Curated annotation (Swiss-Prot):
Gene of this entry: hspL
CDD domains reported in the protein's UniProt record: ACD_sHsps-like (cd06464)
Listed GO biological process terms: protein complex oligomerization; protein folding; response to heat; response to hydrogen peroxide; response to salt stress
Name by which UniProt lists this protein: Small heat shock protein hspL
Pfam families named among the record's database cross-references: HSP20
GO MF annotation terms: unfolded protein binding
Amino acid sequence: MNPVEDFTKLNLFGTFTNFVSAPVPFDCYHDPTKSETILVADLPGVLPNDMKVNVDKDKLIIQGKRECEKHDYLFSNRWCGSFIHHISFAKEVKASDVNVGLGEGILKITISNTPTNNVIGVKMSNNNKVEF
């Protein structure tokens, strides 16, 4: 069985684009050597205290905000404000198998492939570096 098939219900951009003016770059891939699925998003300017990642059965819910700077802009291409993103998986996700890191504007979520029936919140790690 191909582990990537577990993500057939994955909808990466639908919810993000409802809240921000431009799509947030978001990648998802499977690392077969570690049996992990990895999600990576570019979130420059988003701080760990402004992020929350929750697991709800077969869904990963990512929400956060980036403060809007008050300037007399001639134009602005950077997004600000709140966002929420729901990622659905083909199987249930166990919160203890989810590792979240945010550093240098990159959000990295690593998920081990272990099914569960629990609904548990996942807290952000406080490290400033994301290791790949």
